[in-house]
């Protein structure tokens, strides 16, 4: 494969082996990895106005204030997943989840956490349910 810098051919690279990946046909990929798109910050400003088009996970590594997690402003697809990870800064922080509206959260077999546990990481896993137009919270766990 020839490589150009925009004005001249500068080198060539060995093309990968195997079939090319198409954009519309169904293909099985082997030995490929899709890196999650993660938004990580020390403390998330409240409210969290998040967009499922941009990220697969949100992480707060030293949450310093109470946090409201708004409904998704993106255009999720059925069965899309999102993970939220919270660690406070040594003080328990209130968590409020938007419910009851389009692309908001719904508890399915779990209870959404309403506070962080001091110095412990909490994960919340959700799956988008297109029929219900909700992010179904299906997993919550806090570090022991």
Regions found by a protein language model. Give the residues of each.
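Short, well-ordered beta-strand micro-motif
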Residues: 3, 125-127
